[in-house]
């Protein structure tokens, strides 16, 4: 969708990153979608970020998706609430009858909750670390961030940017733009229709 109706329509080399229940990427090179030999290019959610991390739904351990996507954010928030490390998350957890969502974590961030901020920043840093490798390899001019979890809190985007700039080569980031997709969570639907 980003290539047809978003800011990517005017860009020849970009990566669109979807952050939701999973994490994936669309890659556009020379104005064309890169799908790979079997159509699965961009499945960045299964890049390992911690070999001793949790088991992912794919069967491997420490995948980016298992560590930084929406369900992982909510699971970490539940653990923080159960441990009593955040009175606000604990209050929301009990009010929601033992459930926390990414929206709850975002709301706690906006209230200044340090534990919620740490959860979001950690996810952003992990995503940014993976994207830094892609920036060094692919050298896009733009990275667009979208998906249902992308707007959880502005600290997610800030943490992604910080990690990419810290871990990428200066030549690759000199003119790199990392911003939200203006299509938001609708990008995939728009792409399917296009």
Where are these regions (language model features)?
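Short, structured beta-strand-loop surface elements
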Residues: 1
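Glycine-rich phosphate-binding loop of actin/hexokinase-like ATP-binding domains
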Residues: 8-68
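ATP-binding/phosphotransfer module of carbohydrate and carboxylate kinases, centering on a glycine-rich
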Residues: 4-11, 51-55, 60-194
